[in-house]
Amino acid sequence: MIGLDTNVLVRFLTADDPEHSPRAHAFLHAAGERQEPLFVNVVVLCELAWNLRGKAYGYSRSDIANALDGFLNVGAFEVQHRDQVKEAVRDYRQGRADFADYLIGHLNSRAGCQNTVTFDQALANTGGFQPL
């Protein structure tokens, strides 16, 4: 198994770098051909969502959710905490908070937390969160 950094996935999705994007595509394709599992941890997914949403790329929430779903639905990608990531993507599609916020809530719930306290008003009426 090979771990992936955020910048490889950004280059793969955006094709914005004439040197790095083709290398990212070639690497991911070759790993798929070899059936080499590619590990994507939750920090990478949070950074990916943050980068794609930023000024440089300006992806919509829907486009980001679709990209995250893509990694979940392709067998070559071994996504850390896959079930919680799926739940966070679902909530991100429907809600107003950042993807990372929803993932925090689902990971905390999995760890046995009754709820997650927050100052984030976008999460005030979301299950699993309690306004502080």
List PLM regions with ranges.
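Short, conserved alpha-helical segments within structured domains
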Residues: 40-44, 81-84
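Active-site neighborhoods of divalent-metal-dependent phosphate/nucleic-acid chemistry enzymes
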Residues: 75-115
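A generic structural signal for short hydrophobic patches within well-formed alpha-helices
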Residues: 9, 45, 123-124
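Acidic, PIN/NYN-like endoribonuclease modules and their adjacent C-terminal/linker elements
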Residues: 1, 105-132
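Short, well-structured N-terminal submotif of metal-dependent ribonuclease cores
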Residues: 1-40, 56-62
